Regions:
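Extracellular/periplasmic, surface-exposed regions of secreted and cell-surface proteins
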Residues: 11-71, 80-295
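N-terminal, post-signal-peptide soluble/periplasmic segments
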Residues: 1-5
């Protein structure tokens, strides 16, 4: 124009791709993404009565994000609604807390160990989204200037696991080993009557390289035969989009307003019979290293 400002071709008279201008979009549309991520880990422990240790640990992972998009009112995808702006605010909290008691004792060639513990995990995700149209200015930086509310929503997802566990182990002369473990977990993804699952494992190993008949095999640093059998649990339920699904046991309702009156409609029927998926594992392995370098 006469003042030297760039005047873009909005393309009203083009036979195709009207009201688009890629260069103008880069200049007049805007996207802001602000993210804060905090990671905190705290550990404390003590040793007492010679053979006992107690450890407490906690961790927190907190994410805050604000994502803003503003599309101008002259050209591009939002020209027909005189500009469009949206803001999404997201907060995710992941908290883990552990308390573990260990016991270790040597009795000559005998070694005994035991461990009991408790773990709690909590995940909370909260989001708010708003979108407005009809902006009087070519470029606005806040939704308050939009005349019409096009979309407004919020969502909260929560997931919690509580677990108790224990393990015992014994070995003789650093040669023969046996161990057993047990764990009981409760997940918020299941109904209260089927929330808890029991999981366990047993194992044994034989360090062959410690036997007398191997004393001439100086090149063999370690040779161990291992076998284990156990049951593991899985509560990772997915929806039709393969995203985490936290409420499979609950009935779900969606908003269904009638003009100026609020309303809901039943969308999903929960399944209270869902429970932990259990996987049985049997493993046999040979662990070795020789020449002080090859494993």
């Amino acid at each position: 124009d006469s003042e030297g400002n760039k005047v873009f071709d909005y393309g009203e008279k083009r036979p195709f791709n009207g009201r688009t201008n890629n260069l103008a979009t880069l200049i007049h549309d805007a996207v802001w993404n602000q993210t804060d991520n905090f990671n905190i880990n705290v550990t404390a422990g003590t040793k007492f009565l010679r053979h006992f240790t107690f450890k407490v640990s906690g961790s927190a992972d907190i994410l805050n994000r604000r994502y803003t998009k503003m599309y101008n009112n002259k050209f591009g995808d939002a020209a027909n609604v005189r500009g469009r702006g949206s803001v999404e605010a997201l907060r995710i909290e992941s908290l883990t807390f552990n308390q573990i008691l260990n016991f270790n004792k040597e009795l000559g060639l005998h070694n005994v160990s035991a461990m009991v513990g408790h773990e709690s995990y909590r995940y909370v995700e909260k989001s708010v989204f708003a979108q407005r149209t009809g902006f009087p200015l070519e470029m606005s930086n806040d939704l308050v200037f939009g005349a019409q509310l096009e979309d407004g929503s919020s969502q909260t997802d929560e997931h919690a696991i509580e677990g108790w566990f224990g393990q015992v182990g014994y070995d003789y002369a650093n040669r023969y080993y046996i161990s057993g473990s047990y764990r009981r977990d409760g997940s918020s993804r299941f109904y209260k009557d089927s929330r808890w699952g029991d999981f366990w494992s047993v194992g044994a190993s034989w360090r062959i390289s410690q036997e007398a008949f191997m004393k001439n095999a100086k090149w063999m640093d370690n040779l161990k035969l291992k076998v284990s059998y156990g049951v593991q649990g899985n509560d990772n339920i997915l929806d039709e989009n393969k995203d985490p699904y936290y409420y499979a046991w609950q009935n779900f309702f969606e908003p269904y307003p009638n003009h100026d009156f609020g309303g809901v409609i039943h969308s999903t029927t929960g399944n209270r019979d869902l429970h932990w998926e259990k996987n049985t594992n049997f493993n046999v392995g040979l662990e070795f290293s020789f020449l002080n370098r090859i494993r």
